[in-house]
């Protein structure tokens, strides 16, 4: 079972993502901010990370920089309500960029795509 780390400060969204991704057959870990995400990484590597950008304690851009510096092989999807971040230089380090929506179809599709790509790169 593929393991996904969802990093989201809004509890309602975090629970929605967790529920929806578990229904898709994924093992889901959650974190409320970038610092918790880094701690989760130290406990075990997920197969993919869904990362919010605007969060307290440590924002997604700082977390992205730290994660990429340590674990470049883990695909990262930036997931935010603010489409302007797509232009941020640091966001280019992510594997995908998805604007938040109550409909998780795009996010789920991007997760499948990146996990399939990661699986092919291992072969």
Question: What is each stretch, according to the model?
Answer:
Residues 25-32, 40:
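Short hydrophobic/Thr-rich beta-strand motif most characteristic of the beta2 strand and flanking loop
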Residues 62, 82-109:
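Alpha4 helix (beta4-alpha4-beta5 surface) of REC/receiver domains from two-component response regulators
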Residues 8:
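Conserved acidic carboxylate
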Residues 15-23:
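Charged docking surfaces used in two-component/phosphorelay signaling
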Residues 33-36, 59-62:
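Acidic catalytic/metal-coordinating carboxylates
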Residues 52:
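Active-site residues of response regulator receiver
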Residues 77-79:
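Hydrophobic/aromatic residues positioned on beta-strands within the core alpha/beta folds
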Residues 55:
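Receiver (REC) domain active-site loop signature in two-component systems and cognate sites
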């Amino acid at each position: 079972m593929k393991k996904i780390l969802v990093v989201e400060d809004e509890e309602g969204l975090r629970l929605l993502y967790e529920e929806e991704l578990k229904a898709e057959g994924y093992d889901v870990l959650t974190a409320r901010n970038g610092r918790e995400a880094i701690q989760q990484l130290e406990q075990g590597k997920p197969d993919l990370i869904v990362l919010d950008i605007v969060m307290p304690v440590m924002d997604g851009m700082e977390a992205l920089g730290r994660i990429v510096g340590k674990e470049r092989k883990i695909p990262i999807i930036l997931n935010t309500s603010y489409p302007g971040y797509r232009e941020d230089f640091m966001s280019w380090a992510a594997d995908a960029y998805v604007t938040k929506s109550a409909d998780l179809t795009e996010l789920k599709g991007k997760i499948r795509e990146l996990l399939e790509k990661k699986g092919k790169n291992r072969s």
